[in-house]
Amino acid sequence: MRHWQWLLVSLVALGGSGCAGYKLGPVNGLTPREKSVQVIPFDNQTLEPRLTDAVTSQLRKQLQRDGTYQLASHNDGDIVVSGSVTHYVRQEVSFSSSDILTVRDYRLELSAQVTARERSTGKVILDQVVIGTTLIRVTTDLTSTERQALPLLAADLAKNVTALLAEGGW
């Protein structure tokens, strides 16, 4: 009987120590939704149209989904996020097996210079280039395929920006 008690105590101690470092909620020390974020529409420095609308929209959605910050919409956010879309690149990933000059898949990459400032102090808490990527399979109409992939590309960029803001690794 004594052997089972020690085994049970050991299992409970081992199980409890496995969860010792886990933290529920935001990992940057904030209480969830304690601060609010205002997202200013991004500037487009590329020749590709409609990028900034998708990026701004997806960033707002991702911030709401994450829950670390409350989304502010009327110039009253504690943190103001702004940025510029700086690069849009389409790179060949794979080619058709029957014709080595025909591209089968592209990797789309979107880069943005993102800045986050505290409204009250003006202190810059994030200022770096963030990249989002996605893969597309070429169909008969490359332009339509790229247009359909734009929300996915913007969502990946928004996810990366939100992670930088929420985790507080500035």
Protein language model features and the residues they cover:
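A structural "domain/chain start" motif
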Residues: G18-K61, T68, S73, S120, ...
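C-terminal/domain-edge helix-coil "capping" segments
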Residues: A20, E118-L126, T133-W170
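A generic short-segment signal for beta-strand/edge and adjacent turn/coil regions
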Residues: W6-L8, I40, E48-V55, D78-V85, ...
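Sec-dependent bacterial lipoprotein signal peptides
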Residues: M1-C19
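Surface-exposed short loop/turn segments
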Residues: R65-Q70, N75-I125, T133-T145
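Soluble non-cytosolic domains of exported or imported proteins
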Residues: Q45-S57, V103, R107, T143-D156
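Generic marker of residues within folded, mature protein domains
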Residues: R2, V9, G29, S73, ...
